Amino acid sequence: MAPRRRRHTRIAGLRVVGTATLVAATTLTACSGSAAAQIDYVVDGALVTYNTNTVIGAASAGAQAFARTLTGFGYHGPDGQVVADRDFGTVSVVEGSPLILDYQISDDAVYSDGRPVTCDDLVLAWAAQSGRFPGFDAATQAGYVDIANIECTAGQKKARVSFIPDRSVVDHSQLFTATSLMPSHVIADQLHIDVTAALLSNNVSAVEQIARLWNSTWDLKPGRSHDEVRSRFPSSGPYKIESVLDDGAVVLVANDRWWGTKAITKRITVWPQGADIQDRVNNRSVDVVDVAAGSSGSLVTPDSYQRTDYPSAGIEQLIFAPQGSLAQSRTRRALALCVPRDAIARDAGVPIANSRLSPATDDALTDADGAAEARQFGRVDPAAARDALGGTPLTVRIGYGRPNARLAATIGTIADACAPAGITVSDVTVDTPGPQALRDGKIDVLLASTGGATGSGSSGSCAMDAYDLHSGNGNNLSGYANAQIDGIISALAVSADPAERARLLAEAAPVLWDEMPTLPLYRQQRTLLMSTKMYAVSRNPTRWGAGWNMDRWALAR
């Protein structure tokens, strides 16, 4: 975790990068007037919901698609750091201890349906992700759990957010950013209630109904009428949803009510990754591909395309189900002893990853996290695995987000290595998203990135991503619960001192490698493939991917 001064320096640098991409795209359109009207963009996985804050939504490719339809007080730039979005509003520090922040939404901020963006949306985001209100299927409580209260007058543009004493979250800039603020008036209109009043007064029956709609009302399904799309999926950004196609693609069009700089390209169709990417690249029917490296096999780059491979902030890992054959730590450790982590990482072209609580960055803290404890799980040891099971056979079902050639090969590698230990590993096809399949007991292990994601899955913050193993957190898919680890994760969120963070990580590592809720494999690598005629597309290691600035993209005809 970088100290605060360094983080501010990187944010300033990102503003320069953003300006450069804007100049490049503007130069194309202003000088030549030849920008294409449409771009086709392929992302990691299914687009199942507009609400990327649910467990399923956070693990999907939704953040890649909707970073510029649902804006917030910041967005994640090309290095994964949060950049202030002053088009949306401003954040000011009122007091440092306890931490008190004032959030001021732009007077011009309005949804595509004509309704104003208000502090009610902040109250809903906090309530859904704070862990205080039952029923919300939120992916994470990180940061929001430390908010003591929000002062908001319904319908107004300003909110004061007060944190619990001694809980001054270091990465508070991660809160209320792009894709985190859902339009609360959609729920208010359906229930005919004052959502903010119901939440702040903790009206139990109303909260139950609000949570139910927050979880499901923004599910993306083909066949919705134009009026329903307009009313249910309003946008607060440069793009808005026009339609959902039968094959799951989402069509975005320029939002004529957007109050900032207008989108350069008028239409972007966002496609879930399919098995036909190579064919689509060969026939030039796709302009930008933003997926996990190796997921499409040996993707050949034609002369008319350019390709960049780079590390994400997410960790590819085995996430063990809380029930079934791997419910006990003994059997999880046995499986880990026969997983060839060295060979799997080598196939991905990267070192083995060991960190669970400092996963988002490559630095000295991350490199040291769990390194000593992980040594016994670095190479295949089928004899030790067999002994750990007492010679009892074990069957393990592993699932993953399809299609993904690299993960399919990984499961095959694990199956071959574990067979001598009496462990039968099978590759299981499921008809539900990976996190749901794990919850439902359809698989014993989910092979995925941070939070069960098909893509990066990372927030870009080590402290925030560590909540994946905090009890009660939605994307704690293994159902892991350990009071000591909860305390360490909580302490990491409010500490910027490298020495203290190193101490906390060293305390956690022996516990986590003994209880084995997950098995980290390697840092997920990304492939960004684009037409040589594309302008202003840049990489991003977080779950928002290349879509973080899609309103600046331009395709030369």
UniProtKB/Swiss-Prot annotation:
Pfam families, sorted: SBP_bac_5
Transmembrane segments: none
Gene3D superfamilies hit by this protein: Dipeptide-binding Protein, Domain 1 (3.90.76.10), Dipeptide-binding Protein, Domain 3 (3.10.105.10), Periplasmic binding protein-like II (3.40.190.10)
A GO-annotated cellular component: plasma membrane
Residues bearing a lipid moiety (N-palmitoyl cysteine): 31
GO biological process per UniProt: peptide transport
InterPro entries: SBP_5 (IPR039424), SBP_5_dom (IPR000914)
Localization per Swiss-Prot or TrEMBL: Cell membrane
Membrane topology reported for the UniProt record: Lipid-anchor
Lipid-binding residues (covalent, S-diacylglycerol cysteine): 31
GO MF: peptide transmembrane transporter activity
Signal peptide range in chain numbering: 1-30
Keyword terms of this UniProt record: Cell membrane, Lipoprotein, Membrane, Palmitate, Signal
Superkingdom in the source lineage: Bacteria
Primary location group: membrane
Family: To M.bovis Mb2616c and M.leprae ML0489.
PANTHER family: MONOACYL PHOSPHATIDYLINOSITOL TETRAMANNOSIDE-BINDING PROTEIN LPQW-RELATED, PERIPLASMIC BINDING COMPONENT OF ABC TRANSPORTER
Protein name: Uncharacterized lipoprotein Rv2585c
Species: Mycobacterium tuberculosis (strain ATCC 25618 / H37Rv)
Lineage: Bacteria, Bacillati, Actinomycetota, Actinomycetes, Mycobacteriales
